[in-house]
Amino acid sequence: MARPSRQALLALLLTATLMNPLGDLYGQDPTLAADRWNRAALEWIQLLQNGSFEEAGSRVDPAVPAGALGAAELETLWAQLSAQLGALQSVSPGQVGASGPYHIVRVPASFEAQSLIIQITLTDDLTISGLYFVPAEPPPYDPPAYIDQDAFEEVEVTVGNEPWALPGVVSVPKLQGPVPGVVLVHGSGPNDRDETIGGSRPFRDLAWGLASQGIAVLRYDKRTRVHGPRVSATIGLEEEVIEDALLALALLRDRPEVNPAKIFLLGHSLGGILAPEIGRRDGGLAGVTVLAGSARPFFEVLTGQLEYIASLEEDPNSPARVQLDSLLVTVERMQAGEIPDDEAVLGAPAPYWREVAAVDPVATAAGLPIPVLVLQGGRDYQSTTEDLALWVKGLEGRPGFESKLYPNLNHLFGPGSGTATPE
């Protein structure tokens, strides 16, 4: 399960506080930035850098859930970020985009350890409605050896309609006759069509690999990525995942190159957890594949992730470990129903987490009259071999069920060795 964002989980490992003054970070006064959106974004970053968290918090849109971008949360986040990446060395005016009434500024920022994009969402009156830390442009894609780029072509498509239309692409094999088709459903967070995480693009690997073998694959940018600022703070799984996945399946089924009787769904992480429900709702799939889909009770999964990360912190008294322990207490309170609905935990309000906790993917899969394939990486500490065991226990002996463990693969199904970490 990956809903606690990579940024949030990595942040829990961080300890130090940014002390460097702003100095010449901008190379110019922020008031000289190209437009009012950049000026507002750069001025806000300057407040964070100067330690003026109360003032920074006062510029946050009142519609943002309590506990998300308040002064205390901003202070903790900025301290965590600097401890992970070192001192902030420079920022510059960034690209400005619009999504409905919101304006998104992608500010390039250089830290000692690496560069990233500080993505700030602004309202028309220049209040802050969103803050994300996005990896800088990944390195050029190096296709795996199993991909034959001459075996398929890519066709741009649009999933759904306004106001939530999503750009996507179908990898179409260059074969005669209708071919099988697969829709890929992302994990949590504002993922792009490739499910890009650092230098990894697991969904492009899958799409191009399957297309090389004669299978059409549809992948698309997630709603929370394309329309993030317009998505309600009370968004649920229906709006975040299920509705768009069903629309994508319908789109692929209607394409002339694809055999409508051989449409499959492949979900990763949160997408894997919801894959059986999406399959049940669609009613016409030929099969479902689950990659790294947790089967344990959600709060057990979340607590397990946090405890694992805490175990990587050698000093039990370090600020990072103290923050982890505090978050574990918060999770316990959330499980007990003691967190108000408007309070954000790990970037989402408590009702969201309760909705995730109510999902029982194994029970739903057991009721599907179609094949189910479950794949799991042995180095994955988010979805683990315990989850795979529960899938097997619930579905073993059922016609069409298969499972496979890949001992050396992580949550993204990339190879590795040694202790797995969030990095």
Regions found by a protein language model. Give the residues of each.
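Alpha/beta-hydrolase active-site loop
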Residues: 235-256
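Conserved alpha/beta-hydrolase "acid-adjacent" motif
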Residues: 381-387
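Short beta-strand/loop motif that positions the catalytic acidic residue
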Residues: 368, 374-376
